[in-house]
Amino acid sequence: TLNAYCALRKNAFDIPTVHMYDLYAPMTRDFEMKLTFDQAYDLLLEVVEPLGKDYQDVVRGAKDSRLIDVYETPNKSTGAYSAGSAYGVHPYVMLNFRPELDGLMTLAHEMGHAMHSYYSNHNQPFAKSDYTIFVAEVASTCNEVLTIHALRKKHEGNKAAQAALIGRMLEGFRTTVFRQAMFAEFEMIAHNMEEAGQPLTRESLCAAYYDLNKRYYGGGCRVDKLVENEWMRIPH
C-alpha cells in the first residue's frame, strides 16, 4: 500500500517523519550512474531485445534518422514528449537528456510512446489508429520496467545499485498508479464543482487538491500545506 511505501522510506532514511518532498529523494546515495546519450541508446537497444528484432531495428532507425531532439537548448520547452499523432509520419521525440539514470529512463519511456504510435499507425487504418492516454502509458512504462530489470542484472551483487534501482521502480509505481489516479480524481472533482455551479477559484481548487493529498498520503506522510499548489504545474 501507499502507507507501507511511506514507512519504507521513513526507515530507509532514518527520519522521524516523511514529508512529501522526501518521496523524491533517491533511496541511496551510494549508487550513481553516468552515461552519454549514445551509451544510453545502446543500452536501450539491449533492453528492448525481448520485444523482437523488428522493434529493435525501428528504435535504432529513429536515432540514425535523427528523429530525436536530444539536448537542452536555449528557449526549448522543458520535459520530454513523443509526437506521434500525425498518421503516416514517423513519430518524433523531444528530450532534454541528462547523462544519468533519469535520462535513460526518460529515453526508454518516450521511445515506448513513439514505438506504440509507430506500430499503431502501421497496423491500423487512420480511423482506428488513435489510442487513449491510459493505454499509451502501458507501452511507455513497459520499457521502464524492462530497463530496470536489465540494469538489475548488470549490477547483480551490488547492494547499493539494487537498492537504488528497486527504489526507482517503487517510486515509478507510486507516480504511475497512485499519483495518476489522484490526478484523475482531482479532475473529476473540478468538473463536478463546475457542473454544480460552484466557482472554480484558486482557493477552491487548492483546497480540493490538498484534501485529496491528505486522503492518499495522510496515513504515512506529513502532507505539507504547500502541496496544495502542485496541481497548477501538472501540464497533462
Language-model-detected regions and their locations in the chain:
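Cation-handling catalytic/transport regions enriched in His/Asp/Glu
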Residues: 1-236
